[in-house]
A protein has these predicted regions:
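Phosphate/pyrophosphate-binding loops at sites that engage ATP/ADP/AMP, CoA/4′-phosphopantetheine
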Residues: 5-6, 43, 118-133
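Active-site metal-binding loops of divalent metal-dependent hydrolases
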Residues: 140
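Catalytic domains of carbohydrate-active enzymes, especially glycoside hydrolases
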Residues: 1-11
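Active-site-adjacent loop and "lid" segments of alpha/beta metabolic enzymes
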Residues: 15-33, 37, 43, 51-52, ...
Length: 185
């Protein structure tokens, strides 16, 4: 934050490919203390797939929810989106963190993910959510191989026609290492 970040993303459950899930209690215990320390000082994005974690974080002062499951993991997350109207990232991913890389199959990754977002937007609107605090994340590295990731980066502008801001997460991405042939990415 002191180096220029406008927001810090905090999460208590790893969602990197191959990771194992943690229960709600474990996840909350991992983030509760840090949120208490920083949420009033620094804008916080809460990275979670669980509605109760989202609601607890929002009540503490979290400014944005980052749902890497794209509203797919916990059916109650859409109620949080409707109730609180804070910015909410809907990320594209397939499967679960544990198996997503095995499910990296697309006819055309750009169009398939575009259709995925169209379906999520229809779902949101069908639930009576009118606000536009939605951010779309094509999920670089989440259920995608090197070719998929590169095509998404090259063609990310296709998603602008959906009418929402686009977020491209780039933390610790293995494909950067694969391209650069360096181990420090």
């Amino acid at each position: 934050y002191k180096s220029g970040a406008s927001m810090i993303d905090v999460g208590g459950e790893s969602t990197r490919p191959g990771s194992k899930p943690v229960n709600e209690k474990q996840e909350w215990n991992r983030i509760n203390k840090i949120l208490k320390l920083i949420v009033k000082k620094i804008p916080i994005s809460l990275d979670t797939r669980k509605s109760r974690i989202m609601e607890n974080g929002i009540r503490m002062g979290v400014k944005l929810i980052n749902d890497v499951s794209g509203l797919s993991y916990d059916p109650k997350t859409i109620n949080i989106l409707k109730k609180y109207k804070i910015p909410f990232v809907i990320q594209h991913s397939v499967g679960t963190p544990e198996n997503m890389q095995k499910k990296a199959k697309y006819k055309n990754e750009l169009l398939d993910i575009y259709d995925y977002f169209e379906d999520k937007i229809k779902l949101i609107r069908s639930k009576g959510i009118k606000h536009n605090n939605i951010i779309l994340d094509p999920g670089i590295g989440f259920g995608k191989n090197l070719k998929h990731n590169m095509n998404l980066i090259r063609g990310v502008s296709i998603f602008h026609s959906l009418g929402f801001p686009i977020l491209v997460g780039n933390s610790r991405k293995r494909f950067i290492k694969d391209i650069s042939k360096k181990n420090d990415s």
